[in-house]
From Swiss-Prot:
Cytoplasmic-side positions: 1-17, 37-57
Signal sequence range: none
Biological-process GO terms, alphabetical: amyloid precursor protein metabolic process; amyloid-beta formation; developmental pigmentation; melanocyte migration; negative regulation of apoptotic process; negative regulation of neuron apoptotic process; Notch receptor processing; Notch signaling pathway
Entry protein name: Gamma-secretase subunit PEN-2
Gene Ontology CC annotations of this record: endoplasmic reticulum membrane; gamma-secretase complex; Golgi cisterna membrane; membrane
Length: 101
């Protein structure tokens, strides 16, 4: 998407929609928000909507970082303890890997 052609008010609206969309368990939207609007928020000359866009980009980065930390922690714990959890670990698995269980 070419953000050069979009008016600043619409950029702010789009940035806000992607930020709020990330709360619907769609952290990929936060990543897209960061990638698309980083230049607008931090590298372009100042304009009226820029502080709000900067705020949404920072909050998106924080949300994405938190989401990645929680997901990484869960994956690590699940992979390490799945076999010890017995039936509950099997119930939570989509596929049961071969090996010790």
């Amino acid at each position: 998407m070419n953000l050069e052609r979009i008016p600043n008010e619409e950029k702010l609206s789009l940035c806000r929609r992607y930020y709020l969309g990330g709360f619907a368990f769609l952290p990929f939207l936060w990543l897209v928000n960061i990638l698309w609007f980083f230049k607008e928020a931090f590298l372009k000359p100042a304009y009226t909507e820029q502080p709000q866009i900067k705020s949404y980009v920072k909050k998106s980065a924080l949300g994405l970082l938190l989401w990645v930390a929680v997901l990484t922690t869960w994956i690590t714990v699940f992979q390490h303890f799945r076999a010890q959890w017995g039936e509950v670990g099997d119930y939570l698995s989509f596929t049961i890997p071969l090996g010790t269980a």
